[in-house]
Amino acid sequence: EDYERLKSHVLALCFDTGTLGTGRLWHFHPVAFITHFRRCCWLSKSELKQIVPRNLLRMAGQNDYRWEAIIYRDGVGSLADNIRTHINRAMQKHLITTPLRLACFLGNGIQETGWLGTMEEGYRYTERDPRTHQIVRRYNIWYYPWYGRGLLQLTSPLNYFEYFSFRGRVYPVNIKDTLINEYNRLYSHRGIRYTDNHLSDTENHIPENIISWRDNVSSDNHEATSSAGFYWASRNMAYYADNEHILERCSVNTRRNGVKIYYRSQAFWQASAAVNLPAQIDNEQYQGLNGFNERCCAYGSAIAVLT
């Protein structure tokens, strides 16, 4: 009797698809199985590689567009190879689990990290003599050492300390306030950024643990992606990513490479501006956001692969 009940139960779960032929029986239809597991949006190595575009559209100046090849390295031990699992975990944790959310998240993160080539901003500059082209000096960007780090380039004392709080870390409030005030002072007075700058760790007696927290955002892959998740959550990027994505086909004349096409949408602009340019979220002219054309190249690839 028990066997007959078990057999009836098993038969109820099985079905002959008919369409696949050879008389096979399936406990779960393979197409339904694949469809269900695709919803988790866990990217394989090959899927992530497909999202990285082969070329970028860079604006070198006003109406000066360059069509340039992207060098993407994802060999064993590379940054792209090592960080992929951490990116997937961060996306699962923060519910970046729909194709359009992934497109908005990765469209920004892939571009900001130089196509998954580095987790920190290029903060070191070189000044050359305009006549001889000899190196005059090398210097750090004015907001050093609080320059961009991580998958979405956490930048400035305010954002770092907000991230530390997001992670439940405790720090002296007076140090945070001093650094934020100094950053704001320099931001408002361009002429003194390099002549009257007081953001250094030494001058502000920054504790070693805070320095480690900050530096780990670029050196630790978990921190690099966790900080991006913080941006996603705290800047409400999902709200904009979930809006309707009405794609605009953009055609531009490039130098030496003729006409090239890329796609953009107001939803992607708003999700990007929420982190990088909050005051311009509703700007329908797509102006003011650094590298937006390049971001659109990654966004378009993600849309093509994931939807």
For every predicted segment, state its role:
Residues 1-136, 169-171, 175-176, 192, ...:
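Cell-wall glycan-active module
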Residues 144-210:
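A structural motif
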Residues 211-219:
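Active-site rim elements
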